[in-house]
Amino acid sequence: MNQEVKNKIFSILKITFATALFIFVAITLYRELSGINFKDTLVEFSKINRMSLVLLFIGGGASLVILSMYDVILSRALKMDISLGKVLRVSYIINALNAIVGFGGFIGAGVRAMVYKNYTHDKKKLVHFISLILISMLTGLSLLSLLIVFHVFDASLILDKITWVRWVLYVVSFFLPLFIIYSMVRPPDKNNRFVGLYCTLVSCVEWLAAAVVLYFCGVIVDAHVSFMSFIAIFIIAALSGLVSFIPGGFGAFDLVVLLGFKTLGVPEEKVLLMLLLYRFAYYFVPVIIALILSSFEFGTSAKKYIEGSKYFIPAKDVTSFLMSYQKDIIAKIPSLSLAILVFFTSMIFFVNNLTIVYDALYDGNHLTYYILLAIHTSACLLLLLNVVGIYKQSRRAIIFAMISILLITVATFFTYASYILITWLAIIFVLLIVAFRRARRLKRPVRMRNIVAMLLFSLFILYVNHIFIAGTLYALDIYTIEMHTSVLRYYFWLTILIIAIIIGMIAWLFDYQFSKVRISSKIEDCEEIINQYGGNYLSHLIYSGDKQFFTNENKTAFLMYRYKASSLVVLGDPLGDENAFDELLEAFYNYAEYLGYDVIFYQVTDQHMPLYHNFGNQFFKLGEEAIIDLTQFSTSGKKRRGFRATLNKFDELNISFEIIEPPFSTEFINELQHVSDLWLDNRQEMHFSVGEFNEEYLSKAPIGVMRNEENEVIAFCSLMPTYFNDAISVDLIRWLPELDLPLMDGLYLHMLLWSKEQGYTKFNMGMATLSNVGQLHYSYLRERLAGRVFEHFNGLYRFQGLRRYKSKYNPNWEPRFLVYRKDNSLWESLSKVMRVIRHK
């Protein structure tokens, strides 16, 4: 049997053992906890002195510093070029992480290897030293177990009830001399033979420090037992937690402590409260400190570790791949740490709502307390809602959090004033200021589904908050106290009002004050780009007056777009030098991300699909555009006799067609205005993707008109030069609706013939919306749904009629798409586009 197979078998056995032990512990712990009166536990908690809690948390955070001696010994033994301060900071972070997700200390060992591998040339010796540290976590307990074996600590009660524990103690105790002898005979460094002994002493002191923290928890909850008996129970519990491989020893450690103190006659409610306080002080507090420290550490260490690893250097491509993600992860560590701290802060102060309610019940001025309670609750909820925004480095979310911290501070100062909590709020506030200066964006996009989710989440949190307060008051039997119930009745609505006011103020600040940040290039730059590189079927719409422009740094390419509802809706493909499109889009997306806007492309071709895909977009087919090949177009032949009949009819009625070049006279514009107004019939003009009747816009291109025999304009169409591929398009097509004549046919036919005479080779007749969308059962559901709309809702909008009409000109159909981010909603994106088109 080779070593690899042995390792696999060992891993399977280890996992099986840990799983079986976890199931056993969970079942036993459930049985024990089922008999505990949680109301009595809450009563006991309400009796605890606050100053004692503060001292406990300080002691819990400080006790982990002892473990830093491992790293001090390690750095000195290997003569690492690293400052003592950095060693202490890094060690604290490692040990806090190891305490939560330890798996017998293997997590801490792995992180140590990653960090310190960069500071020594002898990697083998480093691994040997780290192995000693890992094993010494058990040898410290082994030394303490010896003290139980020799009856220095009294564990007789628990040993009499659980006899097999005695044999575990013997085995663990016997491990100590073996380890000391081995570490001295075969040390990792011959000049440091006593490293194993030093680590054992550090481990022993650290376990004693943890025991003191738990013992102090017992003193706080008035669970008085002799220290000698207590320490014996703690050692046995620690052994159980360590060998269980369960992160933090959760369950196994707690079960032994619960059973041990039960044998000493301590009420289970007090033991449970003692364990909760211990977990908070010895695990939660150090993690908070570690999160703060991690905002400033680990960046260069992790980077150098990956760069220097022998497994990655030979594989250059793989290294580049991993390094790209590694840099992203490292960059997010500070914001992630702060987001976690803000989350914990909101949770802690949500619990403190109970303190405000409790104080209010015994104070005559209920109204003041409940206004403060509403402010406190609102601030906590806002803090919680902006955790993701803080992680995403949004300035708006950080400002929300800063305002929330200030409101919580005010409510705390006027109610349950605690200097330690106010100090903590000040620390978080300072970290938020630092984060605000580093933030990469002003705000995140506002999406409807996110708003709905936040509303539902807020209602859920407020409901849970109400249940928590009500349940606690019931458990403490203080509902009998007389109070102003009318104030309680309006507490929920007052909270909602405060949240709405704060959100409204910040939203106004960012949506209006920061709207000045939006920039737009000059139209002259766009004209120069089109003249040099050509345009497209939509490029003439730069003159419509309802768009802004974004150019690249060298002014060789641009986009035309419009802002609407936290989105930048771009019309068509980029224009200009195709080699600059990547740079242009990257700059545009960076610009949009900074301002917190979504990016939507409307009516783009399939030519640049790979480019849009690179920016994390998905596509929806809007329909197809009819492009007529003028080289093949003719009114001759049997199939075209309908075209000839239409043209002949206009000739018989003395209706003429002509192209009028700008500039236009006021009289001519007034004639067109008369036709346009009658054609619109009080309907609203469309915008953005089409032009509108505007003298300045119309004066940018020729206009085709049809006149009756009195020389009055009865129909007109505006031309749209495209500046590419010898193509031309039309925009506005309007006629007098009271005339029973095929004026649209006449305009199209005359325009087609005129365009062909002028040497154009392509004529764009516009898009047939939803045409040829979702026709296969393999298509996306959203496209199949759109296809059904095309087929069955022709009465609301002439989808099929529009395609049939254009098909008689035998065009080539080119697809047009909507491009939107993959995490956006299609229907919300379509809604924003429609709002842009229908509202100027």
Swiss-Prot record:
Subcellular location: Cell membrane
Keyword match Transferase: yes
Keywords from the named record: Antibiotic resistance, Cell membrane, Lipid metabolism, Membrane, Transferase, Transmembrane, Transmembrane helix, Virulence
Keyword Aminoacyl-tRNA synthetase: no
InterPro entries the record matches: Acyl_CoA_acyltransferase, L-PG_synthase/AglD, LPG_synthase_C, PG_lysyltransferase
UniProt-listed GO biological process terms: lipid metabolic process; phospholipid homeostasis; response to antibiotic
Residues in the Extracellular compartment per record: 30-52, 111-128, 183-200, 251-271, 359-369, 472-489
Catalytic activity: L-lysyl-tRNA(Lys) + a 1,2-diacyl-sn-glycero-3-phospho-(1'-sn-glycerol) = a 1,2-diacyl-sn-glycero-3-phospho-1'-(3'-O-L-lysyl)-sn-glycerol + tRNA(Lys)
Entry-linked Pfam families: LPG_synthase_C, LPG_synthase_TM
Function, as annotated: Catalyzes the transfer of a lysyl group from L-lysyl-tRNA(Lys) to membrane-bound phosphatidylglycerol (PG), which produces lysylphosphatidylglycerol (LPG), a major component of the bacterial membrane with a positive net charge. LPG synthesis contributes to bacterial virulence as it is involved in the resistance mechanism against cationic antimicrobial peptides (CAMP) produces by the host's immune system (defensins, cathelicidins) and by the competing microorganisms (bacteriocins).
Similarity-based family: Belongs to the LPG synthase family.
Protein name: Phosphatidylglycerol lysyltransferase
Native organism: Staphylococcus aureus (strain NCTC 8325 / PS 47)
